[in-house]
């Protein structure tokens, strides 16, 4: 802290954000901001996070980046999402690598974030209409790779959801 600086007193009425019970839907091209620690915070952009359930998010991370090393060391993370359709949230939870190599993208790992809390940052004074935007500047291979990784994550999410659904038309145990 700077010499002579004093910590700002916290006002009880503004320290807590309302929480959501479940993750909302957001547009495909949403860019999130992943926060990891070492112990200081580090924030990186994450392209196209995939909603994998009410309280799970899947992302792909380049395997040679510091963010992945920090996540492995300290799996408590936060993912800020500002997306079109007035999505403004911070999902806090525990991350873990679920695939060391992604199909057709061996330099990327797949990460699942199990969400403990979803801070709702929407405000009545404004709405998020587009969220963070970025454009691919090199050849189309980067965009094709991103689409492929997201399609893989979505497929894994759908398969997991199907496995967690109770079987239809099956008699309940104990009933004839």
Q: Where do the model's predicted regions map?
A:
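Binding-site signature for planar aromatic cofactors or substrates
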Residues: 1-176
């Amino acid at each position: 802290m700077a010499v002579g600086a004093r910590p700002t007193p916290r006002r009880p009425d503004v320290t807590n954000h309302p929480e959501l019970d479940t993750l909302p839907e957001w547009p495909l091209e949403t860019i999130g901001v992943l926060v990891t620690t070492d112990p200081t915070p580090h924030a990186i952009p994450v392209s196209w996070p995939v909603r994998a359930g009410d309280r799970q998010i899947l992302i792909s991370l380049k395997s040679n980046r510091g963010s992945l090393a920090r996540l492995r060391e300290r799996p408590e993370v936060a993912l800020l999402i500002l997306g079109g359709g007035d999505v403004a949230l911070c999902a806090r939870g525990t991350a873990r690598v679920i695939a060391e190599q992604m199909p057709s993208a061996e330099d990327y790992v797949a990460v699942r974030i199990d969400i403990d809390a979803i801070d709702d940052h929407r405000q009545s004074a404004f709405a998020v209409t587009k969220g963070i935007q970025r454009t691919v500047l090199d050849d189309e291979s980067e965009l094709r790779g991103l689409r492929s990784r997201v399609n893989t994550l979505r497929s894994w999410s759908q398969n997991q959801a199907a496995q967690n659904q109770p079987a239809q038309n099956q008699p309940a145990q104990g009933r004839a």
